[in-house]
């Protein structure tokens, strides 16, 4: 009976971590900060064309949000001295800044990602 309980707990742990990973993969993260003009432009663009997507805006000046940004920078091997906002994470891709090229990248990645609320 003890082994059955241990096995069930192991399976439950695996299932819960799989759920947590999939929910994280269903979000687009936009790291921004107050006063960032490019962040505002990115926000307005996403609100207009991608409002059905699960986009989470994260202000890097609040709480420990900067640590989350650093975690993604490390994951994508982005040097700290070249970080800026907006920094957008879409699945296994990231975008730094916001201009014509970044809009094209965002559109391409968003179509691949297809995460809706």
Sequence positions of predicted segments:
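Positively charged n-region of N-terminal signal peptides that target proteins for export
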Residues: 1-7
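C-terminal motif of bacterial Sec signal peptides marking the signal peptidase cleavage site
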Residues: 15-18
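Local sequence-structure signature of Cys/Sec-based thiol-disulfide redox active-site neighborhoods
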Residues: 21-56
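Solvent-exposed loop/turn segments at secondary-structure junctions
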Residues: 34-37, 60-65, 93-96, 101
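Thiol-based oxidoreductase modules, predominantly thioredoxin-like and allied folds used
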Residues: 54-71
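Structural micro-motif
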Residues: 70-91, 99
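Non-catalytic, surface beta->alpha helical segment in thiol-disulfide oxidoreductase systems
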Residues: 89-117
């Amino acid at each position: 009976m003890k082994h059955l309980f241990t096995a069930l707990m192991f399976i439950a742990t695996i299932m819960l971590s799989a759920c947590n990973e999939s929910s994280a993969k269903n979000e687009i993260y936009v790291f921004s900060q107050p006063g960032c003009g490019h962040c505002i432009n990115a926000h307005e663009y996403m609100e207009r064309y991608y409002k059905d997507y699960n986009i989470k805006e994260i202000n890097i000046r609040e709480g420990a949000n900067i640590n989350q940004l650093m975690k993604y920078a490390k994951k994508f091997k982005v040097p700290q001295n070249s970080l800026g906002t907006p920094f957008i994470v879409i699945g296994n891709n990231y975008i730094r800044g916001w201009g014509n090229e970044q809009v094209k990248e965002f559109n391409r990645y968003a179509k691949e990602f297809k995460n809706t609320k």
